[in-house]
Design a protein with these regions (language model features):
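Conserved small-residue
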Residues: 1-371, 392-393, 410
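Conserved catalytic alpha/beta cores of large enzymes that bind or transform nucleotide phosphates
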Residues: 367, 373-410
Length: 410
């Protein structure tokens, strides 16, 4: 079979990813990626017809979206076992996996409950046409994850050849147990916002207040800044044993000339960062996911609708705080069109089916959010979200940029 050399070398190098080996799942199935079709007004960049891309505004443009590009599903039982194997004591929302010619995120989702309650069948058919009982499956892979799936005759053929060549499943990343409450912006995220002078002042005020508190001998704010927001009174004193450790033992060390000089030098660097746009906002980075409900619908041959509507995302973090709307950014960002503003879904259905995905951001399958976020997919990409009122106020409506590019074969 013919391959594009560059792609083949990239697939081969997946085995070199820094990762932690884990046990093989007890039952694996490979299914096709779901696809949705919708219509949207877009800025179309067509690079297929000439050397110089043609840019046009297209009304009601037909978009075909691979709504689960780069993601698969793992059962809660597998998530628990893998977490224990990498010495984590919580149930992760997802893990980034590797194996021979295989990469992507596996998110924790109860697809067996879906089979019982929604599909009302235990049988699914894989990409090779073989039937499987979903109750015997722990890991669902998609064709976008298993790059050379059509070079094998079955999942057993793939696993057997992987084992014989020394390959195994491994994890490169695991989702956090909790998301941060505060995140820093950067110049890319800020430079295109339309802000009045008062808005700019209010946007940077929390950062200025933090610096002012530290310079004015606020012991707790200083320790939080130096050692991180997760520091508590019960935190065990541990390395590095430096002036910050001394402050944790005795808060009066803040009055020591050497200690205070170290803090001032640190703050000078922080002030330089602020000038470059590194300012604090309420928000965090989280891993992106497509709508796993669409994948379940697709693999059981049901109409693909998903649970999220156009313009919606699911985020337990924001939903649990009563937030209705957030702005989303993905680095690298190049233009204002790369910013999304989304509504937070909150209903019984999403809360039930996404209950294990509490630290990820789930995109809907019915808009161009992936294109807007500079070609995001779901194999480990992250999004920074914030509910900051001045950031939201400074975002102006723009059309998504959709780029048409030629795709080479495998």
């Amino acid at each position: 079979k013919a391959f594009v050399p560059a792609k083949l070398e990239a697939y081969i190098s997946l085995a070199c990813s820094a990762s932690i080996p884990v046990s093989e799942p007890k039952g694996i199935v490979v299914v096709h990626d779901p696809e949705t079709v919708f219509y949207d007004d877009v800025i179309l960049v067509n690079g297929l017809e000439s050397l110089r891309p043609k840019v046009t505004i297209e009304k009601n443009y037909e978009t075909k979206l691979s709504s689960c590009d780069g993601l698969g599903l793992m059962s809660p039982e597998l998530a628990k076992r893998w977490a224990e194997e990498v010495e984590e004591d919580y149930l992760p929302a997802g893990v980034c996996i590797r194996n021979a010619f295989c990469k992507g995120m596996a998110f924790t989702f109860d697809f067996k409950a879906f089979a019982s309650e929604i599909a009302q069948t235990e049988e699914i058919v894989d990409v090779w046409g073989y039937k499987h009982n979903i109750n015997d499956i722990e890991l669902v892979l998609t064709t976008s994850m298993l790059k050379l799936w059509d070079s094998y005759s079955s999942i057993e053929d793939y696993l057997d050849k992987s084992r014989r060549n020394g390959h195994t499943f491994a994890l490169t990343k695991i989702t956090d147990e909790e998301l941060d409450n505060e995140q820093t912006m950067n110049y890319q995220f800020l430079q295109s916002l339309e802000l009045e002078d008062d808005d700019i002042y209010n946007l940077i005020k929390p950062t200025l207040d933090e610096i002012d508190d530290i310079l004015n001998y606020d012991y707790r704010k200083t320790l939080t800044y130096l050692r991180g927001v997760n520091l508590t009174e019960k935190t065990v004193v541990r390395p590095p044993f430096d002036y910050t450790t001394a402050m944790m033992i005795d808060k009066d060390m803040l009055n020591d000339p050497y200690t205070y000089s170290k803090i001032r030098n640190n703050i000078k660097n922080r002030i330089d960062q602020v000038k470059l746009g590194v300012i604090n906002v309420h928000g965090n980075f989280s891993i992106l996911s497509g709508d796993p409900y669409t994948l379940c619908q697709s693999m059981f041959n049901l109409p693909v609708t998903g649970l999220l509507k156009r313009g919606e995302i699911y985020s337990y973090y924001w939903q649990s705080r009563g937030v209705k709307e957030v702005a989303g950014f993905r680095a690298p960002m190049t233009v204002h069109n790369n910013i999304v503003v989304k509504q937070i879904a909150n209903n019984d259905e999403v809360n039930k089916w996404y209950k294990y995905m509490n630290t990820v951001t789930i995109l809907n399958a019915w808009d161009n959010a992936c294109a807007t976020l500079n070609g995001a997919d779901f194999d480990g990409d992250t999004i920074m979200t914030t509910d900051n009122e001045y950031v939201l106020k400074g975002i102006k409506p723009t059309l998504p940029i959709v780029c048409l590019q030629g795709a080479s074969s495998k």
